[in-house]
């Protein structure tokens, strides 16, 4: 069943409810009720599925007393959920405004949602993401090229990134970055110059990012997609970057970390096996903790090395697919 917004925007009831419950409608989170976290949403989703409503969309027409009686929520929880579910007018206008800048929202109830996020993160996958660009790129094999802003990229690092970008284009891998100044912006420029596809996953500033020259060009050419879990006008923060990197590591076959401040979730990705092939560049001393915890060292990549590495990734992906077939 579809629910039509006041401006003619169509969403399934489940998708609509997921956005109402979890989406911040202002960048500074000034809301009548605080949107649900992913963990909170999963709990409400499970309760709805176990109830006579059958799914999350069935809650759209339930009053506060119904939420208390049939889901077993407290009065405070029920009021919060009810308030969030009745932001439909504000949500419709907010989505229409975003669409004017080429931004839409996709939920786990939509076919366009990246399947790898659900497969890898499972219950921790975000209920929705903001998206712009060519969504078909999200299903391509991909590598991440990562670094933090404020660290100078020397000629040797640039040459290594060139080899990765060239190899990715040659073998049909998208290149994923975090969109920050430094390694990410250099990588995006090389993709634009040398060929291939780019996926930027942001920790803030989505609307402004889409207007940068390189990204605007790649979007116009159908060679880029941009994702974010944050309001398009939200500022970049370290906490947003940590949440962003969970998506990065879940979406890629391999990640190449050129530099880090140690606060971007790389160690968690290693510990949780979110990304089985995480490489750390030996040319940056700050990568030592990653190397000590099991990241694979790399330095001095040569033309052709990418082809050998991706054979290992392909075998890992095939093994994972076989496991999913058995579930």
Each language-model region and where it sits:
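Short, small/acidic-rich helices and loops at N termini and domain boundaries
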Residues: 2-109
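Glycine-biased, small-residue-rich flexible motifs in mid-sequence functional cores and linkers
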Residues: 2-30, 93, 101, 108-327
């Amino acid at each position: 069943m579809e629910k039509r917004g006041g401006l003619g925007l169509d969403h399934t009831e489940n998708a609509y409810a997921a956005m109402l419950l979890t989406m911040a409608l202002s960048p500074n989170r000034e809301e009548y009720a605080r949107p649900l976290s992913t963990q909170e949403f999963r709990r409400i989703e499970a309760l709805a599925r176990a109830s006579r409503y059958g799914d999350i969309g069935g809650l759209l027409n339930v009053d506060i007393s119904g939420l208390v009686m049939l889901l077993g929520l407290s009065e405070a929880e029920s009021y919060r959920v009810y308030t969030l579910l009745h932001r439909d007018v504000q949500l419709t206008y907010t989505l229409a405004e975003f669409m004017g800048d080429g931004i839409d929202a996709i939920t786990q109830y939509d076919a366009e949602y990246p399947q790898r996020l659900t497969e890898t993160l499972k219950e921790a996958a975000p209920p929705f993401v903001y998206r712009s660009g060519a969504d078909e790129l999200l299903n391509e094999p991909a590598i991440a090229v990562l670094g933090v802003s404020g660290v100078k990229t020397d000629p040797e690092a640039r040459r290594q990134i060139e080899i990765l970008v060239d190899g990715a284009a040659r073998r049909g891998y998208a290149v994923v970055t975090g969109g920050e100044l430094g390694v990410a912006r250099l990588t995006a420029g090389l993709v634009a110059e040398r060929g291939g596809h780019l996926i930027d996953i942001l920790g803030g500033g989505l609307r402004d990012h889409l207007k940068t020259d390189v990204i605007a060009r790649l979007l116009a050419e159908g060679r880029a997609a941009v994702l974010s879990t944050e309001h398009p006008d939200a500022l970049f923060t370290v906490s947003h970057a940590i949440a962003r990197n969970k998506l990065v590591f879940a979406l890629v076959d391999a990640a190449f970390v050129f530099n880090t401040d140690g606060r971007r979730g790389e160690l968690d990705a290693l510990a949780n096996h979110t990304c089985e092939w995480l490489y750390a560049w030996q040319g940056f001393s700050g990568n030592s903790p990653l190397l000590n915890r099991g990241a694979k060292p790399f330095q001095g990549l040569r033309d052709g090395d990418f082809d050998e590495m991706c054979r290992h990734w392909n075998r890992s992906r095939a093994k994972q697919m076989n496991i999913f077939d058995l579930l």
